[in-house]
């Protein structure tokens, strides 16, 4: 089916996610590993062409896949730089899902390199991006996997803030209803009756 989608955005996504899968398969040493590296480079080459023609749509994908190639090739300095570029590009072009993924992969990279403090920063940024994107289950998964690094759940904080905000809105609505009841009433008995209904 791939030959029918060459000129569609889905083909770029196919190459991006296909490249990520190849990087993971190569890292896990699924046999034989070398074809995965070769396929990753083919996917990357296609994304490079598209990123050159339309960076708004493809640059974040290309940079993130480039970072993954650098990671599995054993180039830690280049890997960290490319992750950062991918995050900045995703932020610039409003790819919140790719921003979350780039932060997550950068966090995993630093965690595996025993840089827990740096990993925490990236993983926390990933949580926020995923939450902004609406990927609640992904946030829960990250918090379960990296609970020792991330600490308190961001979902609990969000829930507490939502309850507090809801109570503040309810208080403001009560004040407005009371004010309207007093302003619109001509009879004190009706004002008292209306206030009792509001309460």
Predicted regions and their residues:
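Helix-coil-helix junctions within alpha-helical repeat/solenoid scaffolds
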Residues: 1-131, 138-150
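Phosphate-binding active sites in nucleotide-utilizing proteins
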Residues: 194
